[in-house]
A protein has these predicted regions:
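Sec-dependent bacterial lipoprotein signal peptides
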Residues: 1-4
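Long luminal/extracellular ectodomains of secretory-pathway precursor proteins
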Residues: 6-24, 28, 35-239
Length: 239
């Protein structure tokens, strides 16, 4: 039988939790991998007053805290400035729960509202329109059914399928590799020349389009920038 002695540490006294701060909203901002995001702008707006708001930026741990007045209700937003393909974008960040987008009152307490960077999906507090690509975190593409340079417009009833394949080395707005091919469809209708596809994770893609009408499938030739110029079977683009 072997015996050994060791020093036993006395149990430490638990640190009391920090008391709630009255009329405060706080939380943490993370990216799609759950990592904290520093330097994100967080803004609380009071819709009951004229230009009543307060703004802060997140610290290195992705945390923020805003002291609010107890008057009325508040809505809170977060934005991230991103450099992508030599352009600057101010992107609204999402929230963990749909109910977090609603206005809230502090009622003398601390309210927690966390944010997460979403590359696609519905924005719960915005009207959504499939016809105009609005109300989503992802980007949208606008197509016009044209008659130009000897190419007739597609006939009503044509099912149009758009395939977006990330080019080599493409990345999404958050810097993660773009690996998912996107396929979306719409149908040509009589009297309508304009069509949208939406909620696409923004990246650099190669686009190809096919049309199917009466069981016959054809390649759709495309131009860009709404100009009737050269047409191509595919295009590399970003948005």
């Amino acid at each position: 039988l072997l015996l050994a002695s060791c020093e036993v540490e006395k149990p430490t006294t638990p640190t009391p939790t920090q008391p709630e701060e009255a009329n405060t909203v706080t939380g943490i901002v993370v990216n799609s991998q759950g990592q904290p995001m520093e330097g994100v702008k967080v803004r609380a707006d009071n819709p009951n007053g004229n230009n009543i708001h307060s703004e802060v930026t997140t610290d290195a741990a992705g945390r923020y805290k805003i002291k609010l007045t107890s008057i009325g209700s508040w809505k809170i937003y977060a934005w991230k400035e991103v450099q992508f393909m030599d352009k600057t974008y101010n992107l609204r960040l999402g929230m963990k729960n749909a109910s977090d987008y609603d206005a809230f009152t502090t009622e003398g307490k601390t309210v927690v509202r966390d944010f997460v960077w979403k590359l696609d999906g519905r924005i719960p507090d915005r009207s959504a329109s499939a016809d105009y690509g609005m109300g989503y975190f992802g980007g949208s593409l606008y197509f016009v059914n044209l008659n130009g340079k000897g190419y007739p417009p597609m006939a009503p009833g044509t099912k149009v399928t758009v395939t977006l394949t990330p080019v080599s080395g493409a990345k999404y707005l958050d810097g993660t590799p773009a690996t998912t091919t996107v396929t979306k469809s719409f149908t040509i209708t009589d009297g309508n020349s304009n069509y949208y596809i939406g909620d696409i994770k923004v990246a650099n893609y190669r686009m190809s389009i096919k049309g199917e009408h009466n069981g016959v499938e054809r390649v759709v030739w495309m131009g860009h920038k709404s100009s009737i110029g050269d047409f191509f079977q595919w295009l590399d683009f970003y948005f």
